[in-house]
């Protein structure tokens, strides 16, 4: 039958008719026009409503539970009366992270119900472990399940960030500027400079990236280079890109070590997308807890409580993001109403992996286009000219438990290349990495590394080896090297000992050897600071040349308030030098760090080197740029000076602002309208950022969700009332620049004494300003908050007459005493007749 709306009139009749519902029919009920369903007398009005059809809530109820306090709503059902038979037309399930879940079999039974009739007990059996029970008295439907019919509420391992919050054209420009000057020993000098620019312009999720640099600015050898000009759309788990980029910026799921330097003009498509966030911090093996009612789950390891979490009734996966990494057992304890219901041991499997996380789908990417290969040379022996070629390939990656892998197959210049990368943690102690390459010109490469933490937790060891043989086509060099190293933490054996590290590198192709040994020990750590001892030795052999050995020993002193000093000696190039270093850090201001170092030869033959050398540096963080200025006089007599600065500019419509930060290529412009050096703070995902003056730009990482809250700054005397725009929720893609324009009132707490023009005090008078009112005391004194944009106080008397006080608050901050002020327009307070509300505005 066609579905009809339950009209307001019928709702009223139904509400009235419910009063006459009875469990047992009696004689009087039989006389009226009524119907009995499931032992319940249905009045005529309610029967008509049921024939029209109505929606009732659907709750899940655990069999054997007393009462309905732990029932959870999981959807709704549409019921109707058909020729005296009560039926379910359909069921609509409502998904919720907090709700219990039903098994897939039970879910399918619910979704396929169509015109299913209730039996005389108002029940519809679904499976051996689940049935539907209808209560006409409460007008609700219960899904009564045994534990076997419950599903498990698993935690999502991935999530799409959704649509962009910025629906207009916007842009982010990042800049990096550097100037270098070398003053030679003979008086000559040379200067070089560069300016790198990265611009991302976006419309919602679509963006265009331009990346390039200018070199030798202001010199006769000026040059420029464009590294990337590309359109990209990364949305809902898929990424498309097209344009030009150099091979240094090539993005691939798998290794691509056989690609030579050059530029690629092509397209790329795949599901390796930043718009989908994968959570790899959960245990690979889910930790599951069953709760018969709402309660708590306690996780304990070796008697130590790790986590307490609250859940509703059902099977739930416990959140393991905050647990330590490793493979270990935890005791899962379920507590309901203060009583321990169950206790069992489960395994946590959390290991670092390079994949997208457990449960992530297979990642893939296809790409291709035209490849301009740059001229290539190997030590002047082999030379290949620049060349144009085709390029096509595919990449894929995945994981199985803690094992992750990646593979790439591609071709160019009539060569086929295949590469793989494998990562396998062997328990908590050992991690193995393998990377291989094989090409059709008989080129091959193998890179293997193993890292291990030895038993006891006081030492670690790593081994790397690379061997590469190149055929007659690929533009790469042979390689044959190995390295081994380790760290021994002697603190675990005796607290007064330190940490010893050693490494050895052997490049057999160039017949060079290099080893280092370092020792660090904390001598003192307390209220007055910390003192540490460093010592080490390094030795380098290159081919047939004699060995070069260097030694050092130093004491590092760190003091409170950001002070650091170091004193020591080094021996290298046949002579010994004494070294002094100092550094000071600042929490506020433009200059954040200043430092200096000084070295003097104290023994041995310095040859042509100077006996005294040193340098100084400063790190700055200004409104529009941040960077470093460094001046250094080396032992060879050269004086090197360099300046680096970077920052960002954000633009959207009429709004443009700059920042000395380069946190990302998206951001937010705050148009606060604050005068002079006014300051408030922006709290973004828990981090606090200062906002100064009328307009600020804060660059942020793209592909992120941000919760932004404006608040008063703890470092400012000013008080602001943020009337609107206090909180915002943003989703930003590359190039997205959001604009937040809050209504901000700068508040000043003003106190003083108000007089009429003849000097008489306005005692017990109601005075007003732009945002509020107050009453003076018997001495005419008052205290009230005033908006600095409207620095006036007025007093209304004798009907429509008004006097006004103009306050001078330009320099006022926080609270101010203005002393005696005159209300212009009121000749005398004595002449005012106080009658009720006469003096109220």
From Swiss-Prot:
Disulphide bridges: none
UniProt keyword Plastid, yes or no: no
Entry keyword set: Fimbrium biogenesis, Signal, Transport
Signal peptide segment: 1-29
Induction comment: Negatively regulated by H-NS. Positively regulated by IHF and EcpR.
Family recorded in the similarity comment: Belongs to the EcpC/MatD family.
Protein purpose: Part of the ecpRABCDE operon, which encodes the E.coli common pilus (ECP). ECP is found in both commensal and pathogenic strains and plays a dual role in early-stage biofilm development and host cell recognition.
Name of the featured protein: Probable outer membrane usher protein EcpC
Annotated organism of origin: Escherichia coli O127:H6 (strain E2348/69 / EPEC)
Gene it is expressed from: ecpC
């Amino acid at each position: 039958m066609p579905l009809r709306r339950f009209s307001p009139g019928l709702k009223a009749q139904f509400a009235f008719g419910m009063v006459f519902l009875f469990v047992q029919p009696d004689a009087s009920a039989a006389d009226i026009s009524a119907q009995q369903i499931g032992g319940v007398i249905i009045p005529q009005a309610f029967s008509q409503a049921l024939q029209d059809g109505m929606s009732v809530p659907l709750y899940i109820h655990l069999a054997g539970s007393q009462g309905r306090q732990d029932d959870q709503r999981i959807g709704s059902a549409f019921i109707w009366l058909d020729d005296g038979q009560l039926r379910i037309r359909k069921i609509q399930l409502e998904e919720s992270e907090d709700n219990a879940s039903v098994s897939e079999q039970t879910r399918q039974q619910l979704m396929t119900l169509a015109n299913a009739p209730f039996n005389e007990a108002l029940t519809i059996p679904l499976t051996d472990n689940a049935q539907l029970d209808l209560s006409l008295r409460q007008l609700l439907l219960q899904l009564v399940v045994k534990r076997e019919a419950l599903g498990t509420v698993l935690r999502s391992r991935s999530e799409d960030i959704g649509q962009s919050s910025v629906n207009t054209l916007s842009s982010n420009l990042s800049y990096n500027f550097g100037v270098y000057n070398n003053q030679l020993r003979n008086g000559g000098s040379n200067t070089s400079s560069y300016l790198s620019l990265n611009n991302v312009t976006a419309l919602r999720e679509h963006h265009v990236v331009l990346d390039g640099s200018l070199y030798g600015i202001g010199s006769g050898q000026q040059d420029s280079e464009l590294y990337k000009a590309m359109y990209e759309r990364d949305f809902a788990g898929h990424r498309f890109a097209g344009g030009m980029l150099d091979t240094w910026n090539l993005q691939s799921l798998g290794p691509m070590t056989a690609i030579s330097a050059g530029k690629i003009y092509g397209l790329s498509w795949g599901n390796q997308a930043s718009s989908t966030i994968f959570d790899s911090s959960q245990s690979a093996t889910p930790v599951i807890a069953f709760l018969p009612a709402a309660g708590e789950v306690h996780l304990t390891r070796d008697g130590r409580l790790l986590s307490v979490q609250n859940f509703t009734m059902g099977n739930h996966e416990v959140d393991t993001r905050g647990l330590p990494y490793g493979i270990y057992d935890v005791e899962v304890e379920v507590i309901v109403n203060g009583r321990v219901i169950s206790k069992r041991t489960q395994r946590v499997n959390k290991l670092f992996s390079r994949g997208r996380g457990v449960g992530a789908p297979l990642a893939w990417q296809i790409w291709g286009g035209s490849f301009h290969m740059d001229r290539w040379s190997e030590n002047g022996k082999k030379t290949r000219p620049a060349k144009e070629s085709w390029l096509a390939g595919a990449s894929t990656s995945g994981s199985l438990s803690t094992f992750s892998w990646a593979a790439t197959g591609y071709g160019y210049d009539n060569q086929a290349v295949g590469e793989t990368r494998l990562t396998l943690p062997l328990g908590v102690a050992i991690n193995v990495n393998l990377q291989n390459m094989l090409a059709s010109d008989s080129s091959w490469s193998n890179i293997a590394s193993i890292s291990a933490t030895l038993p006891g937790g006081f030492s670690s060891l790593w081994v790397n080896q690379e061997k590469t043989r190149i055929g007659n086509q690929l533009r790469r060099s042979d390689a044959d090297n190995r390295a081994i190293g380790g760290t021994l933490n002697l603190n675990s054996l005796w607290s007064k000992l330190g940490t010893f590290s050693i490494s050895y590198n052997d490049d057999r192709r160039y017949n060079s050897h290099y080893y280092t040994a370092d020792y660090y020990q904390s001598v003192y750590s307390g209220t007055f600071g910390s003192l540490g001892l460093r010592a080490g030795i390094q030795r380098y052999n290159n081919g047939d040349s004699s060995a070069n050995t260097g030694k050092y020993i130093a004491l590092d002193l760190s003091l409170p308030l950001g002070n650091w000093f170091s004193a020591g000696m080094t021996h290298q190039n046949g002579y010994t030098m004494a070294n002094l270093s100092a550094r000071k850090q600042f929490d506020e201001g433009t200059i954040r760090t200043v430092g200096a170092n000084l070295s003097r030869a104290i023994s041995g033959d310095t040859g042509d080197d100077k006996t005294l050398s040193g340098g100084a540096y400063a790190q700055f963080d200004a409104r529009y740029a941040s960077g470093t200025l460094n001046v250094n006089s080396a032992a060879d007599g050269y004086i090197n000076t360099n300046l680096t600065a970077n920052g960002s500019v954000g633009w959207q419509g009429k709004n443009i602002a700059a920042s000395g930060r380069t946190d990302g290529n998206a951001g937010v412009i705050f148009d606060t309208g604050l005068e002079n050096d006014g300051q408030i703070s922006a709290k973004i995902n828990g981090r606090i950022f200062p906002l100064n003056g009328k307009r600020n730009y804060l660059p942020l990482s793209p592909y992120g969700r941000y919760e932004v809250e404006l608040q008063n700054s703890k470092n400012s005397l000013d008080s602001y009332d943020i009337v609107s725009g206090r909180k915002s929720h943003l989703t930003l893609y590359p190039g997205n620049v959001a604009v937040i324009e809050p209504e901000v009132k700068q508040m000043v707490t003003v106190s003083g004494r108000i007089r009429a023009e003849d000097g008489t005090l306005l005692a017990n008078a109601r005075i007003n300003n732009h945002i509020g009112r107050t009453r003076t005391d018997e001495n005419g004194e008052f205290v009230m908050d005033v908006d600095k944009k409207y620095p006036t106080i007025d007093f209304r008397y004798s009907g429509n007459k008004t006097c006004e006080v103009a306050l001078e608050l330009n320099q006022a901050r926080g609270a101010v005493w203005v002393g005696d002020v005159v209300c212009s327009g009121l000749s005398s307070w004595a002449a005012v007749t106080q009658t009720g509300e006469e003096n109220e505005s």
